[in-house]
């Protein structure tokens, strides 16, 4: 190809690209919404910790970073029987739990508290194995969710794995699956979410199964969240090593993806680590802290205060890419006397492992790679700002196009049995229409909230529908969240519905004579207060079960009068007013 032809081709491609970009548009950074991929457990003792005593206030941390949180898992409850759930929050806090719940939900954060298993060995399995007791347990949990207006519940039943005997696992599995199916049905019927938190499982084709009885493939269609506990590979009572190395838990994550929808999966991420004593050289003096003995368990360290380890004299920190964790090595020397008073000294070698900001970023990139729901932090409030900022970088890169919904209604008030027409649009923030997507009508009444499909948007992003209303209703319209788009939601429209009034009154009356005004309201119901009105109240009555009413009154003034019937406003109905009727009072 000649240079002249090559220049012409490049020029043509450039013009074509400019044209196509201006024609179809692209979403700017301002038109995209940060993806809420951060989650975690907030314990009862740290929700409102006493900062004067050095305690953590997890709520402060969540509020400060609220744009990152799609959900919070308050670690507040322990199951003790099929009918009893212990409230740990109530024993730790003077602030009523309705305060943090309302605060979080006002920030658009779903509140899905965790229930742990506080029963003895084998007890929970037996409960789930009994049809009657399992039904009772489902009701106990669903009642807790409803009573506190939670968005769902998270089950962290680790007793199966770490208390019950391995020989019982084959029996536990079908009982667990049956329980999950029944609890999910109850929660979903009330628009509540079911989350489960479990240790790792492995693909059985590899010859390893992990804690297989949690049965991810069997429960995948029933749960809404799966938190994988990707930590405690090494613990305080083991040899030194990484807490939750990526190379260890990623195979479990890949196995989960074979049966569980990616957006349901959250990587359990520790913001803690351990500081082990790995070697003691010499004989330590009597004033050496107990924690410096080789026989002692490792001391826990939190990401928030890890700098104290890094500041140790001679400390060398190394970030391990494979593990996604940082290892800090240092030595401490102690001089003094032994039990006999003789001079002595020792050198204590330490090895500390923890997940720092880089480790959080690495796990967030796994969320991006596999299109997961996010990461779940244990425990909220003990992480530093650098870590969540690393996650935020990925959350921004994974941002969704913002969907903006608008809707108008043909009326704001109507009579019982009449319908209202709605016309609306869904567009991206930059004005591009959201076409061909299902639209749902969200109906909120005093009796509850329902959601039903009404069709799809047209090519220009518009939708129309007409609704027959039987009571006062708040209506909004929505589109589902997708990987690329946010949830679309129109403002709510409140449509008042008034009862239909039919009534009779004589066209001519004599003053001083008593008359009966009769009528009926629709829908028919007893107990509706009905008033005869001529500009002021002149008589009243109450409807019977068939909606009929009777008002007795005696006109006292001569002349042409205007009368109407008025009903009181109710929870489900607006006040009704009939048309005025002219009556000649002689």
Q: Which role does the model predict for each range below?
A:
Residues 461-465, 547-551:
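Short strand-edge motifs at loop-to-beta-strand transitions and within beta-strands
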Residues 469-491, 561-579:
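Enriched for extracellular/lumenal, surface-exposed ectodomains of secreted and cell-surface proteins
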Residues 72, 155, 226, 267, ...:
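Conserved, mostly hydrophobic/aromatic
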Residues 271-363, 395-398:
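Glycan-binding loop/region signatures in secreted carbohydrate-active enzymes
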Residues 289-290, 394-430, 494-516, 522:
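Beta-strand-rich domain onsets/edges
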